[in-house]
Amino acid sequence: MPAVDKLIIMVPQLPPKEYSPNARVHWAARKRAGDNYGNEVYAEAVNARNLVNWQALEYASVKVEVVFAEERIRDEDNHRARFKPGMDALVRAGIIQFDDMQHISTRI
């Protein structure tokens, strides 16, 4: 089976609001929320990875699509920060090798 270079991972949970730069929460609550979301992303990523012949990408473009129930204008910077535990989970799951700015371009 040939290796694929595109993977769609759907997570039925919003990134944690505790990771927003505007959030004022206790560090333990932030950690708990990040761990929960990261574990959800990790599980979905591993499931998607195991269905195909996936090799971790050194350079990647990550597109994050967040769907909300109500239509309001949202700040992209906040959502980029909120996705931090999800990006870390993609590295842990072996989807991407690195999550720094030299190896990843991200669009939220």
Language-model features: where?
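Catalytic phosphate/metal-binding cores of nucleic-acid and nucleotide-processing enzymes, i.e., regions
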Residues: 1-108
